[in-house]
Amino acid sequence: MTNILAIETSSVYCSIGLAKNKEIYIEHSQEENTHGKNIFGFIDNLLKKSQLEKEEIDFIALSVGPGSFTGLRAGCSVAQGLAFGLQKKILPLSSLRVLAQTVFLEHKAKELFIVKEAHMNDLYVGKFIRKNNDLALPLIKDAAIKKTELSDFISSDNKEVICSNCHEFLDYLIKPNLLKINNHAKGLLHLACYLNDLDTKLKNPEEVYPTYLSGTDQWKRTK
């Protein structure tokens, strides 16, 4: 049996989850940009609800980006601090994959094209397919593109288009299969619960960093 703490702060909303064996507990903010205000309180609330001690957490699942710079730094700092203090490892996962996983848990889509606002005229994009256990499997590497390049990525073959924090920009697509959704800890927890089926493995806290993508210089910071 495994106890997993999930920290999802890659969007404007703070979303924290805890899996105690097969029981799932979630704390999700409805206020934007309140990561610093809520993250520790959310974790404490989840530990109380689940009747777990911090020391009983087996590992921490972390959404590492791409996404909100401030949110990613906050989530990563907290995850690293807890992991160091508890001598636990971290499972770093793409925030685009977490978003796709959240959709697969709520909708019957088989294939997704993810679009997420990156600011500075850039968008983050990714493609995912539903596999065994409803897991989101990436079809391409996460990328940052210019908004003007979006038409090169979206085609009539895309079964579903998912957007996060870019609703007004994507409204012009007028696609019947356009869904608007944000990252949620339940998607992160679902992926983490199938750790053995993922291509990403547990890492020591000093090996985990936020992932930033830029369409301007294609810079990616990962270790």
Predicted segments — roles?
Residues 1-23, 32-34, 91-223:
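Oxyanion-binding and handling regions
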Residues 30-38, 69, 73, 77, ...:
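Residues at secondary-structure transition points
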Residues 35-50, 96:
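Short, well-ordered amphipathic alpha-helical segments that serve as non-catalytic structural scaffolds
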Residues 38-41, 77, 81, 98, ...:
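Short amphipathic alpha-helical face segments that pack within enzyme cores
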Residues 43-59, 152-159:
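Phosphate/pyrophosphate-binding loops at sites that engage ATP/ADP/AMP, CoA/4′-phosphopantetheine
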Residues 59-95:
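DPxDG-like acidic metal-binding loop motif
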